[in-house]
């Protein structure tokens, strides 16, 4: 009832664990939703779904990018690509040789999920108000979100508030 689609292309890119998020599935999601809502956070599955939607949209947009290039995408679609890259590199990628990133608690995963999703949602709103995509994707908070996975458990709450306020 669970399938983890191992992906040699991800392994070749040194993305570990090399599990393809689009080909993998679990038939236990309904049961897991109850558990995550009760034990981690009420919005866990909602955040997960937002990330999965972005990853699926990225896969569709990659086909366009391969044919006509990234410049053919609208700023909103380019932002989706950047958000999906953040999900892949900052949330899904794990460095098993790093002292802190070897293991990530569910609390920390939830915080990371919230940061990535919040950045995307706030950026979409800013784009709608006329903000520059280039400025949005080069904001220092992007790097802080990327480094959040290296924050030690005892400093999570303080660092989360700091990054979220950026």
Regions found by a protein language model. Give the residues of each.
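Acidic, low-complexity intrinsically disordered tails
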Residues: 113, 148-166
């Amino acid at each position: 009832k669970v399938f983890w689609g191992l992906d040699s292309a991800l392994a070749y890119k040194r993305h570990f664990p090399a599990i393809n998020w689009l080909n993998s599935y679990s038939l236990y999601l309904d049961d897991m939703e109850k558990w995550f809502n009760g034990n981690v956070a009420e919005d866990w599955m909602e955040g997960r779904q937002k990330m999965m939607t972005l990853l699926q949209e990225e896969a569709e947009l990659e086909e366009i990018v391969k044919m006509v290039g990234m410049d053919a995408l609208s700023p909103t679609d380019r932002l989706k690509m950047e958000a999906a890259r953040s999900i892949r590199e900052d949330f899904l990628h794990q460095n098993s040789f790093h002292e802190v990133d070897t293991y990530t608690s569910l609390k920390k995963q939830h915080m990371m999920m919230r940061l990535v999703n919040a950045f995307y949602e706030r950026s979409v709103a800013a784009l709608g108000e006329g903000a520059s995509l280039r400025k949005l994707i080069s904001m220092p908070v992007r790097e802080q979100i990327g480094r959040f996975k290296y924050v030690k458990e005892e400093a999570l709450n303080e660092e989360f508030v700091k990054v979220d306020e950026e």
